[in-house]
UniProtKB/Swiss-Prot annotation:
It comes from the Eukaryota. This is Kappa-conotoxin Mo1659. It is found in: Secreted. Keywords: Amidation, Ion channel impairing toxin, Neurotoxin, Potassium channel impairing toxin, Secreted, Toxin. The mature peptide does not contain cysteine residue. Expressed by the venom duct. The modification Tyrosine amide is found at Y13. It comes from Conus monile. Inhibits non-inactivating voltage-gated potassium channels in rat dorsal root ganglion neurons.
Amino acid sequence: FHGGSWYRFPWGY
């Protein structure tokens, strides 16, 4: 995802 951003999950892919 964004590498550390709360997009849809807290771990941030």
